């Protein structure tokens, strides 16, 4: 056996000469997070190594080819095997040897992720770092502010997670503001009723669904993601269907990363997930619906009878999209709605780009990925977290990813106007994509004054990807939903996203029944031919950066104050409502003409 001195020297040799490349580094602990204590070397930690995918420099051009109408290859989506052939994952041989040399044996593969469990002491040496516990309110996470990898692995490894991604998980639902309603009979969509509460009949009228009847056997399916221990409730959906005379249908569930499908009203978190499934069914019934529940715990529990503080540290993004990409197209819905996001600046750029590329690969496979733009308007924190403490607008990720369709929010009824909480603006990570160049230029050149543009330019990146892309009703009046068997009102852009997902499901249904492909990556089509199928929203504006969180109505400690910060809804695309709200019948004619 090695002496303890020799063994310690061997461990240190893992870190010293080989670990010469800092892979990710934060200039400061993100705003709101406080160092509690260094983690004990004996604490367990589970980490994921994201292996690099090759040829991602060709992703955008391939998306352009397959998703641009008029191109001979339009709609000829790829399958799982095609993706692996065009964008292969780097070999894991060198990575596995590196882990084995460190004495790490609990290793598993999930798509392009290498998941492993070890002690904090080993991880500290392996990555030349120091893991510590940080707290933000009730949330405590095991994180570090930088880590390194061996020089010979830089071509194989994209990033290690969770390491420098602190985040501030938030869904976009206003479930905390949900208000109980008395039991009411079903009502037809009339001006008086829809001006008070939004029901399925109101959505039929507002978005011109007409008498369209989808076919459950067409192959069109709709999915939604649930995070933060959320799970939709079967009984509540049945009660919602009964309330609004919707023919009964259920939904299927797939569990990812130790997600839990909790159907107990007393213990489950239901507000966001119920809102998703009820509104999807309201719009797209009887099309099949699937819920993907992604847990926050690691892929496995590392040799422990009970979980430790490190067992609930993973963000869902990587595991969620890796799981979806691991399935063949025949096992996936063709449109997926998500209502979960972080301030873009809290997501390390390496991580954001990795996730965004995974979303782009989903688009190549004919799957439309939607994301609620957020409920914090032009921004809530409005202060840079890079140590400079500069006031700035706060875009929201993943809505800023150019390969996702971000759904903003409207309010009021007949006519709809921009909702002041609808998040939007311009990305600081992602440059403006090709498909929205004309639309954003039109906004910047014709619908914002030169003085305003000059003033805002110190707070935002006008060359960045503009979001949202589209919008749907969010709030005022609220949506009527069922929660724990009772009637509530709720809303937010996380209501807008499932509504839009239901409409995309109907459009896919129409195309599949006509022998055509699904819509897939939607944005190039939205900003060209389909723009005619939207009702432009030209009134209202978003707010923010005033020291108050638009979502909660509460003060933001240390938040930046930017006088006069707002975006106006204007003719054409704008950073509040995007291209506007959908007119299904117009959109159906347009997509069937392709």
Curated annotation (Swiss-Prot):
E.C. number: 3.4.14.10
Source organism per UniProt: Aspergillus fumigatus (strain ATCC MYA-4609 / CBS 101355 / FGSC A1100 / Af293) (Neosartorya fumigata)
Pfam families associated with the record: Peptidase_S8, Pro-kuma_activ
Domain Peptidase S53: 197-594
Keyword Metal-binding belongs to the record: yes
GO MF, any single term: endopeptidase activity
pH dependence: Optimum pH is about 5.
Cofactor(s) the record lists: Ca(2+)
Protein name stated in the entry: Tripeptidyl-peptidase sed4
Glycosylated residues in this chain: 191, 229, 250, 568
SMART domains tied to this protein: Pro-kuma_activ
Keyword set, alphabetical order: Calcium, Glycoprotein, Hydrolase, Metal-binding, Protease, Secreted, Serine protease, Signal, Virulence, Zymogen
Chain segments annotated as transmembrane: none
GO cellular component: extracellular region
Catalytic activity of the protein: Release of an N-terminal tripeptide from a polypeptide
């Amino acid at each position: 056996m090695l002496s303890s001195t020799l063994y310690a020297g061997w461990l240190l040799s893992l870190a010293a000469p080989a670990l010469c490349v800092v892979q990710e580094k934060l200039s400061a602990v993100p705003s709101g997070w406080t160092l509690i204590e260094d983690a004990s070397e004996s604490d367990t930690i589970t980490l994921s190594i994201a292996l690099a995918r090759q040829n991602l420099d060709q992703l955008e051009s391939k998306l352009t080819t397959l998703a641009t109408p008029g191109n001979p290859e339009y709609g000829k989506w790829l399958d799982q095997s095609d993706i692996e052939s065009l964008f292969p994952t780097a070999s894991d041989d060198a990575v596995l040897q590196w882990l084995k040399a460190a004495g790490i044996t609990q290793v598993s593969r999930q798509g392009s992720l290498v998941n492993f469990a070890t002690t904090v002491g080993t991880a500290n040496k392996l990555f030349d770092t120091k893991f510590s516990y940080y707290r933000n309110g009730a949330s405590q996470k095991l994180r570090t502010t930088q880590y390194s990898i061996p020089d010979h692995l830089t071509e194989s490894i994209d990033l290690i997670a969770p390491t420098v991604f602190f985040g501030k998980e938030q869904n976009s639902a206003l479930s905390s503001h949900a208000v109980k309603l008395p039991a009411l009979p079903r009502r037809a969509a009339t001006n008086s009723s829809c001006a008070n509460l939004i029901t399925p009949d109101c959505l039929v009228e507002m978005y011109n669904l007409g008498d369209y009847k989808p076919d459950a056997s067409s192959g069109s399916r709709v999915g939604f993601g649930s995070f933060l221990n959320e799970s939709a409730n079967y009984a509540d959906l049945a009660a919602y269907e009964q309330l609004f005379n919707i023919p009964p249908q259920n939904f299927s569930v797939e569990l990812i990363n130790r997600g839990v499908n909790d159907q107990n009203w007393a213990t489950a978190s239901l507000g966001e997930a119920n809102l998703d499934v009820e509104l999807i069914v309201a719009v797209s019934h009887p099309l099949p619906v699937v819920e993907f529940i992604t847990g926050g715990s690691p892929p496995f529990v590392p040799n422990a009878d009970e979980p430790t503080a490190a067992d609930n540290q993973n963000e869902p993004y990587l595991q969620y999209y890796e799981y979806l990409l691991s399935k063949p197209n025949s096992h996936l819905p063709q449109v997926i709605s998500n209502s979960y996001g972080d301030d873009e600046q809290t997501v390390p750029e390496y991580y954001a780009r990795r996730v965004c590329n995974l979303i782009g690969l989903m688009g190549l496979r004919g799957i439309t990925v939607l994301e609620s733009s957020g409920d914090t308007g032009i921004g809530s924190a409005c202060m840079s977290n890079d140590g400079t403490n500069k006031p700035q607008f706060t875009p929201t990720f993943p809505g800023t990813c150019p390969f996702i369709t971000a759904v903003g929010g409207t309010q009021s009824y007949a006519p709809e106007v921009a909702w002041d909480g609808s998040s939007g603006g311009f990305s600081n990570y992602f440059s403006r994509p090709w498909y929205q160049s004309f639309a954003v230029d039109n906004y910047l050149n014709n619908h914002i004054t030169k003085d305003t543009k000059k003033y805002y330019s110190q707070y935002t990146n006008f060359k960045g990807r503009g979001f949202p892309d589209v919008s749907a009703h969010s709030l005022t009046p609220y949506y009527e939903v069922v929660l724990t068997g009772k009637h509530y009102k709720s809303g937010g852009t996380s209501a807008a996203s499932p509504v839009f997902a239901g409409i995309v499901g109907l459009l896919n249904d129409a195309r599949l029944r006509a022998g055509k492909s699904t819509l897939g990556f939607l944005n190039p089509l939205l900003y060209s031919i389909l723009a005619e199928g939207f009702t432009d929203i030209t009134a209202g504006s978003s707010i923010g950066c005033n020291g108050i969180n638009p979502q909660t109505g509460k003060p933001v400690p240390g938040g930046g104050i930017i006088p006069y910060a707002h975006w106006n809804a204007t003719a054409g695309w704008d950073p509040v409502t995007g291209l506007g709200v959908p007119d299904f019948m117009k959109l159906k004619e347009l997509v069937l003409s392709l």
